[in-house]
Amino acid sequence: MDQFRNIGIVGRMGSVKVVESLRQLKQYLTANNYHVIIEEDTSTMIPGHGLQVASKKLLGEICDLVIVVGGDGSLLGAARELAKSKIPILGVNRGRLGFLTDISPSDLEERLARVLEGDYIEESRFLLDGHVERNGQPLGYGSALNDVVLHPGKSTRMIGFDLFIDGHFVYSQRSDGLIVATPTGSTAYSLSAGGPIMHPKLDAVVLVPMFPHTLSSRPIVVDGKSEIKLVIGETNETYPQVSFDGQMNIACAPGDIIRITKKPFKIRLIHPTDHNFYATCRDKLGWASEIAAS
């Protein structure tokens, strides 16, 4: 197990509860002689902290562990920036569901102590890269831990596009768009659109149509190493967008090409030893819960 001495802290902005956990983390870690580095935006949330301040990029270079305080969205943002550094990430849940941020604030110090003593499990999750081309030239790029989504933006018109997988034509479709999700993202937007839940260890990607104008279109699960290409129809009257984890958007135009592939490196997630994917699904999604009688 890794020995953690230099620990970075990243928090979601604008939350009183996050501030409470940040203060608790800072007090606990400094009292136990850990070198704590706080992310530069996060540092503004706790004035007078007296800690070293660094950008997310620098955290990836100088830390042994980064703790993210917030919801799954906060961890998604940190993961995209820290993936290349291969630094382990631990999540403290101050959001809603908490599929990725699985340490509860109520027992933060107890659970954190065990992790820092080496009592934890580690798993890797892959990300997606998305490249948008226009007239054969690069237009934009993004990465995603959950999903890359083609959507109509503010328009209510359908999008016409062609789908290719590994160079093979799959179909032409008119719909509200397409969700391309990792196993991590299969419990997020993809799930809401009728996609399957995939175990995080699967090397696979799911393609989920959004309100397709057909009765036969269904989600497709493909090899994680596949290259997915979307070609936006030339006759589209709408200008769709491509989003990455719902946090970054690239505006597209008719004729643009979107290429989606697996990122060459993965993120490292740290969990308490009692972490279990099925238990998480049961708890967060309400599996096997009974309807209470009125």
Swiss-Prot record:
It is found in: Cytoplasm. The keyword Cell wall biogenesis/degradation does not apply. NAD(+) binds at D72, G73, N146, D147, R157, R174, D176, T187, A188, Y189, S190, L191, S192, Q247. Its main location: cytoplasm. It is an enzyme of class 2 (transferase). GO terms for molecular function: ATP binding; metal ion binding; NAD binding; NAD+ kinase activity. It comes from the Bacteria. Its cofactor is a divalent metal cation. Keywords: ATP-binding, Cytoplasm, Kinase, NAD, NADP, Nucleotide-binding, Transferase. The active site is at D72. Its EC number is 2.7.1.23. It holds the Pfam family NAD_kinase. It catalyses: NAD(+) + ATP = ADP + NADP(+) + H(+). One of its GO terms (cellular component) is cytoplasm. One of its GO terms (biological process) is NAD metabolic process. PANTHER family: NAD KINASE. Involved in the regulation of the intracellular balance of NAD and NADP, and is a key enzyme in the biosynthesis of NADP. Catalyzes specifically the phosphorylation on 2'-hydroxyl of the adenosine moiety of NAD to yield NADP. HAMAP family: NAD_kinase. Belongs to the NAD kinase family. NCBIfam families: PRK01231.1. This is NAD kinase. It comes from Marinobacter nauticus (strain ATCC 700491 / DSM 11845 / VT8). The gene is nadK.
